[in-house]
Regions:
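Ligand/substrate-recognition segments at binding pockets and active sites
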Residues: 67, 213-284, 356
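Long beta-strand-rich cores associated with HINT superfamily self-processing modules
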Residues: 358-383
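A bilobed periplasmic-binding-protein/Venus flytrap-type ligand-binding module shared by bacterial periplasmic
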Residues: 74-79, 136-162, 310, 354
Length: 383
């Protein structure tokens, strides 16, 4: 098989091997509305079929899907490889960490995800329960819209710098739980080119106050922060927003938190670039630092903050340079330059890289944390 790309993409191998790309039986997909025509992006209608059925060659097949409730996977009788001894998985949506903890302790479930520090502490030492810890590539960030129509005062570059200086990053890590890190910039720990962590002594309230005064707000200002009802690996975005509110009160910024459900308008406003000030999270679409380039001006996420390529053409040009660089040393240099450029400037502040904690029954083996799908069900066996 030969792939012909229309433009350079130094992350192509990472994309092809990530869980979001799957090889399907083309005949089955076409029978159910799929197409490989040039206009497939607008004419393919196989999504509804694939939401409730399988067309691949993996170890498990999808036998039941109830949105927002449950997914059932059963062993594929035609699987070509060596199978594990688990015949069926029932995946249930349960956002409450305490309920997960209790049902795991009682033996009603075998694996619990998105647990909090408190529930993990309760499970430590529990009979027949084991805990696996790790660091995800998921990040939480503050977004300040560059378009004054939506961002108001937070669209001012000096105000953005002041907010960056005022945040208590170590306190944010405490809220997110053990294992959380604060990335230096937009490239997470674990990715090629990452410059590590933002130092704790970066926070400086007096400098933040001066920056705010320089921007014309010596007495601060009031601003709405719209936040959704989502969570980041069990960490409620509303909790992060409250911490940001508390931190910014130290420099005279009065934040009014407005909570809005994702489906009730927040999601559309976020994607359409009409949110002025928010706390949000980002999960990677593939395991390569290039996925973070979408935060640059003109990128998918950049435009959600009103950050067009015209605002910072030099930084926007680094997107193309990073995509074209196939030599690892050259890629690393470009990625480091991008991180330095966004360390103190821009509408995004990465405030946390989320940890992952999985608790599971000790009767299971090989329950490990994976970047691409949290846990790999094809590796788990019953002892």
């Amino acid at each position: 098989v030969v792939f012909h790309l229309t433009e350079p993409d130094s992350a192509i191998l990472s994309k092809l091997t990530y869980s979001s790309l799957a090889v399907l039986d083309s005949a089955v997909v076409k029978e159910n509305g799929g197409t490989d025509a040039e206009d497939a992006a607008s004419t393919d209608t196989a999504q509804s079929f694939l939401d409730g059925a399988s067309a691949g060659s993996g170890m498990y097949i999808l036998t039941s899907y109830t949105p927002d409730e449950e997914v059932v996977l059963e062993k594929n009788p035609n699987y070509w490889g060596t199978s594990t001894n688990v015949d069926k998985y029932i995946l249930k949506i349960q956002p409450d960490a305490n309920t997960q903890m209790m049902t795991l302790s009682s033996g009603d479930i075998d694996i619990a995800l998105n647990l909090t520090d408190d529930t993990l502490e309760e499970l430590k030492g529990a009979e027949n329960v084991e805990i696996t810890d790790g660091l995800t590539k998921m990040i939480g960030f503050v977004m300040m819209n560059m378009d004054e129509q939506y961002g108001g005062p937070v669209s001012d570059p000096d105000v953005q710098k002041a907010i960056r200086k005022a945040l208590d990053y170590s306190g944010i890590r405490m809220i997110c739980g053990e294992g959380t890190v604060t990335p230096y910039s937009i490239i997470q720990e674990g990715f090629m080119g990452s410059k590590g962590d933002r130092p704790d002594d970066y926070t400086n309230i007096e400098e933040a106050k001066q920056l705010l005064a320089d921007a014309g707000y010596p007495d601060g200002f009031s601003v709405d922060m719209t936040v959704s009802d989502l969570d980041m690996e069990g960490i409620q975005l509303t909790d992060l927003a409250q911490k940001v509110k508390d931190d910014l009160s130290q420099i005279g910024i009065d934040v009014n938190i407005v909570t809005e459900a994702w489906a009730a308008g927040y999601g559309d406003a976020y994607r359409n670039g009409t949110l002025g000030f928010t706390v949000m999270y980002w999960g990677v679409d593939y395991s390569d630092p290039n996925v973070q380039l979408e935060f640059l001006p003109g990128g998918t996420v950049g435009k959600r903050a009103g950050w067009t390529a015209e605002i910072d053409p030099e930084l926007a040009g680094m997107y193309t340079a990073a995509m074209a660089a196939t030599d690892n040393d050259a890629r690393t240099q470009v990625l480091e330059n991008i991180q330095d450029a966004m360390y103190e400037d821009g509408p995004f502040i990465v405030i946390a890289q989320a940890p992952a904690h999985i608790a599971h029954s000790s009767r299971l083996a090989n329950v490990d944390i994976f970047d691409s799908y949290t846990i790999d069900l094809t590796e788990i066996n019953v002892k």
